[in-house]
Amino acid sequence: MSFQEVWEKEPMKKPRIQKVTVNFGVGEAGDRLTIGAKVIEELTGQSPVRTLAKQTNPAFGIRKKLPIGLKVTLRGKKAEEFLKNAFTAFKACGKTLFASSFDQVGNFSFGVPEHIDFPGQKYDPSVGIYGMDICVTFEKSGYRVKSRKVKRSHIPEKHLVTKDEAIEYIQAKFDTEVVRE
């Protein structure tokens, strides 16, 4: 029996996207970070959070706690819409998604080297080109029991999202090919 048949028969077992995290590693503070914030806000529709350097690196001119990156967490419909555009951009730059990008609980990540590959984006010399990392986290119905305050419990292993389930979900929902090595 395929996963699709199981999901139709038992909807609680169907995985869903918990969140999509978009990371911009700008590498420096200042104008480039400000422009990057405008780019990421235009792509996602949400204002980003600045990420701080964890350690000092004099070779790159980075001090501890200096803002060097941006991130946005998307959930629900916004996450799915952004992921559709991200897969379009990912395919446009000639990349393929490999099964090795998925971990054992179905989460995966990929990178888009240029933000201008997204639909509706044009190159602007004053902005430049920004790349990003996109991380997708999966869950199933009932995952709230592990994070709630009252009567917290663990999720049994049989109810965790597997690598194969996540791959089939992505292939069916977003019409994206995942190459198995």
Swiss-Prot record:
Pfam families xref list:
Ribosomal_L5, Ribosomal_L5_C
Provide one Gene Ontology cellular component. ribosome
- Respond yes or no to whether keyword Nuclease is given for this record: no
What transmembrane ranges does the database entry give? Answer: none
Q: Which InterPro entries match?
A: Ribosomal_uL5, Ribosomal_uL5_arc, Ribosomal_uL5_C, Ribosomal_uL5_CS, Ribosomal_uL5_dom_sf, Ribosomal_uL5_N
Keyword Zinc assigned: no
Entries under Gene3D superfamilies matching the protein: 3.30.1440.10
Q: What keywords is this UniProt entry annotated with?
A: Ribonucleoprotein, Ribosomal protein, RNA-binding, rRNA-binding, tRNA-binding
Per UniProt, subunit arrangement is:
Part of the 50S ribosomal subunit; contacts the 5S rRNA and probably tRNA. Forms a bridge to the 30S subunit in the 70S ribosome.
The record's similarity note reads: Belongs to the universal ribosomal protein uL5 family.
Task: Output this protein's name.
Answer: Large ribosomal subunit protein uL5
- Organism of origin is Methanococcus maripaludis (strain DSM 14266 / JCM 13030 / NBRC 101832 / S2 / LL)
What's the source species' lineage? Archaea, Methanobacteriati, Methanobacteriota, Methanomada group, Methanococci
